[in-house]
Amino acid sequence: FKGGGPYGQGVTRGQDLSGKDF
């Protein structure tokens, strides 16, 4: 996965740090 949550490109997981999918 490529980061796309509220933390931007730095989060490279299936979920962001809030636990939301992206």
Swiss-Prot record:
Q: Which UniProt keywords apply?
A: Chloroplast, Plastid, Thylakoid
Q: Tell me where it resides.
A: Plastid, Chloroplast thylakoid lumen
- In its keyword annotation, does this UniProt entry include Cell membrane? no
Instruction: Name one cellular component (GO) term.
Output: chloroplast thylakoid lumen
Region named Disordered? 1-22
Q: State if Chloroplast is listed as a keyword.
A: yes
Which protein family is it in?
To A.thaliana At2g44920.
Name-wise, this protein is: Thylakoid lumenal 11 kDa protein
Organism lineage string = Eukaryota, Viridiplantae, Streptophyta, Embryophyta, Tracheophyta
